[in-house]
Curated annotation (Swiss-Prot):
Protein's name in the database: Protein S100-A5
Name of the gene: S100A5
Any coiled-coil regions, as ranges: none
Start and end residues of each EF-hand domain: 12-47, 47-82
InterPro entries the record matches: EF-hand-dom_pair, EF_Hand_1_Ca_BS, EF_hand_dom, S-100_dom, S100/CaBP7/8-like_CS, S100_Ca-bd_sub
Cited PROSITE patterns: EF_HAND_1, EF_HAND_2, S100_CABP
Function: Binds calcium, zinc and copper. One subunit can simultaneously bind 2 calcium ions or 2 copper ions plus 1 zinc ion. Calcium and copper ions compete for the same binding sites.
Length: 92
Protein backbone atom coordinates (compact mmCIF):
# COMPACT_ATOMS: atom_id res chain seq x y z
CA UNK A 1 0.00 0.00 0.00
CA UNK A 2 1.31 3.41 -0.97
CA UNK A 3 1.94 5.80 1.92
CA UNK A 4 0.79 9.45 1.72
CA UNK A 5 4.38 10.60 1.18
CA UNK A 6 4.96 8.05 -1.58
CA UNK A 7 1.73 9.18 -3.23
CA UNK A 8 2.87 12.82 -3.04
CA UNK A 9 6.22 11.94 -4.64
CA UNK A 10 4.51 9.95 -7.38
CA UNK A 11 2.20 12.90 -8.06
CA UNK A 12 5.15 15.30 -8.35
CA UNK A 13 6.91 13.04 -10.86
CA UNK A 14 3.82 12.22 -12.93
CA UNK A 15 2.77 15.87 -13.02
CA UNK A 16 6.14 16.85 -14.49
CA UNK A 17 5.83 14.20 -17.21
CA UNK A 18 2.20 15.11 -17.88
CA UNK A 19 3.38 18.52 -19.16
CA UNK A 20 6.92 17.82 -20.39
CA UNK A 21 7.55 16.91 -24.00
CA UNK A 22 4.58 18.64 -25.54
CA UNK A 23 7.16 20.92 -27.13
CA UNK A 24 10.64 19.53 -27.63
CA UNK A 25 12.25 17.09 -25.22
CA UNK A 26 10.16 14.68 -23.15
CA UNK A 27 12.60 15.31 -20.30
CA UNK A 28 12.14 19.07 -19.96
CA UNK A 29 9.48 21.74 -19.59
CA UNK A 30 9.45 24.65 -22.01
CA UNK A 31 8.36 28.08 -20.79
CA UNK A 32 4.89 27.41 -22.21
CA UNK A 33 4.69 23.98 -20.55
CA UNK A 34 5.81 25.39 -17.20
CA UNK A 35 3.20 28.15 -17.44
CA UNK A 36 0.47 25.62 -18.21
CA UNK A 37 1.56 23.36 -15.33
CA UNK A 38 1.45 26.28 -12.89
CA UNK A 39 -1.91 27.49 -14.18
CA UNK A 40 -3.60 24.07 -14.05
CA UNK A 41 -1.90 22.38 -11.10
CA UNK A 42 -1.19 25.16 -8.58
CA UNK A 43 -3.48 27.71 -6.99
CA UNK A 44 -1.10 30.62 -7.50
CA UNK A 45 -3.58 32.76 -9.38
CA UNK A 46 -2.98 34.31 -12.77
CA UNK A 47 0.70 35.03 -13.27
CA UNK A 48 1.97 37.93 -15.33
CA UNK A 49 4.20 37.10 -18.28
CA UNK A 50 7.06 38.92 -16.55
CA UNK A 51 6.60 36.69 -13.49
CA UNK A 52 6.83 33.58 -15.66
CA UNK A 53 9.99 34.98 -17.27
CA UNK A 54 11.51 35.71 -13.85
CA UNK A 55 10.63 32.22 -12.61
CA UNK A 56 12.18 30.62 -15.70
CA UNK A 57 15.38 32.62 -15.23
CA UNK A 58 15.66 31.68 -11.56
CA UNK A 59 14.98 27.97 -12.15
CA UNK A 60 16.93 27.49 -15.40
CA UNK A 61 20.35 27.03 -13.82
CA UNK A 62 22.00 25.65 -16.96
CA UNK A 63 20.52 28.44 -19.16
CA UNK A 64 19.11 26.11 -21.82
CA UNK A 65 15.69 27.82 -21.85
CA UNK A 66 14.05 24.67 -20.47
CA UNK A 67 13.34 23.28 -17.01
CA UNK A 68 14.68 19.78 -16.42
CA UNK A 69 13.46 17.52 -13.62
CA UNK A 70 16.18 18.66 -11.20
CA UNK A 71 15.26 22.32 -11.76
CA UNK A 72 11.56 21.45 -11.36
CA UNK A 73 12.40 19.68 -8.08
CA UNK A 74 14.08 22.85 -6.80
CA UNK A 75 10.88 24.77 -7.65
CA UNK A 76 8.78 22.26 -5.68
CA UNK A 77 11.19 22.47 -2.75
CA UNK A 78 10.86 26.27 -2.71
CA UNK A 79 7.07 25.91 -2.74
CA UNK A 80 7.18 23.40 0.13
CA UNK A 81 9.30 25.80 2.17
CA UNK A 82 6.87 28.66 1.47
CA UNK A 83 3.89 26.49 2.46
CA UNK A 84 5.68 25.47 5.66
CA UNK A 85 6.40 29.12 6.52
CA UNK A 86 2.73 29.96 5.89
CA UNK A 87 1.53 27.18 8.20
CA UNK A 88 4.03 28.16 10.91
CA UNK A 89 2.80 31.76 10.79
CA UNK A 90 -0.82 30.64 10.76
CA UNK A 91 -0.30 28.59 13.93
CA UNK A 92 1.12 31.48 15.98
Amino acid sequence: METPLEKALTTMVTTFHKYSGREGSKLTLSRKELKELIKKELCLGEMKESSIDDLMKSLDKNSDQEIDFKEYSVFLTMLCMAYNDFFLEDNK
